[in-house]
Amino acid sequence: MQANGAAAAAAGEEPAGSGCLSAHNGESSEPAHSNGVLSSNNGLSGTGSTGPTEQPGGRKKKRLSQADEDVIRLIGQHLHGLGLNQTVDLLMQESGCRLEHPSATKFRNHVMEGEWDKAENDLNELKSLVHSPHAVAACRPSSGGSGSEHSPTSCPTADVIRRMKFLLLQQKYLEYLEDGKVLEALQVLRCELTPLKYNTERIHVLSGYLMCSHADDLRAKAEWEGKGTASRSKLLDKLQTYLPPSVMLPPRRLQTLLRQAVELQRDRCLYHNTKLDNNLDSVSLLIDHVCSRKQFPCFTQQVLTEHCNEVWFCKFSNDGTKLATGSKDTTVIIWQVDPDTHQLKLLKTLEGHAYGVSYLAWSPDDNYLIACGPDDCSELWLWNVQTGELRTKMSQSHEDSLTSVAWNPDGKRFVTGGQRGQFYQCDLDGNLLDSWEGVRVQCLWCLSDGKTVLASDTHQRIRGYNFEDLTDRNIVQEDHPIMSFTISRNGRLALLNVATQGVHLWDLQDRVLVRKYQGVTQGFYTIHSCFGGHNEDFIASGSEDHKVYVWHKRSELPIAELTGHTRTVNCVSWNPQIPSLMASASDDGTVRIWGPAPYVDNQEFEEECSSMNS
């Protein structure tokens, strides 16, 4: 923010750098039209305050700091937006502050009244304020249908004024067109906009609006609200970016700061697991934001015991309505998730996987499920989930080992492979489309581009393979075997379970190791971890010490250790649609469903969820 008493401009302008004045206050201001800022200078004039001022009764008012002045202006702007104009007048009178520079106030009023010639003349008065050293920053594109221009931040003053003039004339042109004044609009286009020699591409677009047959057509094509308060307020928001905040406050500045504070508190909350609501009415500003562990999926809601041997894998469907579990007992069980109670019930049992089921993959539309077996298994099963019928049982050779599978995003192809060097791309009928020789695959994932397949191999790395042009490249290199990995929804992050090391987070774009998560016990068993929670802010993994570990993505220390299983936890799956629902599969033959604590028996909850804040 600017210091008090900034030098006044040559044309007798008041200093741009001060929001508070020491002179006496006169008559109250007129109500403003817009943007939550008072439309007059509250009768104030003079220079910035330099010391304590005399108040009625002989008391000296303490000189306000720059922070105090800023807060008063923010409060005044907010109160004015609520229509409390008399309160604003009293606040400004007692504090000796003003909300904005008088030239800016005049400019604002002329814009909101649609007095374009006067607003254009006001730009001459604002030149010296734009030139102020406080009018910072770089030219960046602005968004919006009628705002393809750039907004400034360290552009020459003449260029800034030209950009502001362009915005004014554009609004003037559109309003003429909407009113049916085509000749006047054409005059603005030819004699005022075009001579500016600025943003000729936009001028070509504007000229095309002359062909609009009626006002609705114009508003639709221009993506413009039409003549009136809404479009003019948006115009003012854009124009304000060219002026320093000491001259004109950014619109709704206090709300912006409060919203940022709430978002920061939520971001720092280790247990925040719900959708962010940017509406300030949904939160209390009187206390800091904090989520209780009791709202987090740390409590066992169900124990599924229908499998009769070790459960090696579990995975929720993409729509979150089903859970598939695979076991050493040769079966896959499909469970239905109740959308209201979040309880699971057995829907279908798929049998006949002679070697057991160690990996499962849902098709993108959840209509199909592929099941793979352990190292000795040369077959995979493609099931129709709706009917429970086996569509394809695929095997290329009895010597194969097909232990991993991943769906192409189109849902019509999948890739599969294993540690004996098989790496195939197939269609839904199991027909071989492509193959890659000599790749000993541990785990697979198809990226959203529909071309690239990520594969971890026996060389402790993840490589990207393109089946279209048959190219491959190294992406991740670890020092120990990668037992499994999964990719975040946006394709940016990879979560690896590394033998003897634990859980590692990699940035695939920058190809760097981001974080090593502590606590988990990982030997040479295949353990599958997952991203989860709202916005995938959390990470969960099984462990050989019989626990489920949960971390916040940015914290190396676990925020929860979930107990209940009695043997190694092989896999954890977080429901992609219900952030408070999680499943874990264990060698103890059970699948545990985790959710928030019930309203009663909190003592039992604390025993099950031992949480450590980082």
Curated annotation (Swiss-Prot):
Gene3D superfamilies: YVTN repeat-like/Quinoprotein amine dehydrogenase. Keywords: Cytoplasm, Mitochondrion, Nucleus, Repeat, WD repeat. InterPro entries: CTLH_C (IPR006595), LisH (IPR006594), TPL_SMU1_LisH-like (IPR054532), WD40/YVTN_repeat-like_dom_sf (IPR015943), WD40_repeat_dom_sf (IPR036322), WD40_rpt (IPR001680), WD_repeat-ST_regulator (IPR051350). It holds the Pfam family LisH_TPL. WD repeats lie at residues 306-345, 352-391, 397-437, 477-516, 519-561, 564-604. It is found in: Cytoplasm; Nucleus; Mitochondrion. The keyword Nucleus applies. Residues 1-65 are annotated as: Disordered. Residues 1-19, 34-44 have a biased composition (Low complexity). Residues 100-184 form the CTLH domain. The keyword Cytoplasm applies. GO terms for cellular component: mitochondrion; nucleus. Residues 67-99 form the LisH domain. G-beta-like protein involved in cell signal transduction. Acts as a negative regulator in MAPK signaling pathway. Functions as a scaffolding protein to promote G beta:gamma-mediated PLCB2 plasma membrane translocation and subsequent activation in leukocytes. Core component of the CTLH E3 ubiquitin-protein ligase complex that mediates ubiquitination and subsequent proteasomal degradation of target proteins. Forms homooligomers. Identified in the CTLH complex that contains at least MAEA, RMND5A (or alternatively its paralog RMND5B), GID8, WDR26, and RANBP9 and/or RANBP10. Interacts with DDB1-CUL4A/B E3 ligase complexes. This is WD repeat-containing protein 26. It comes from Xenopus tropicalis (Western clawed frog).
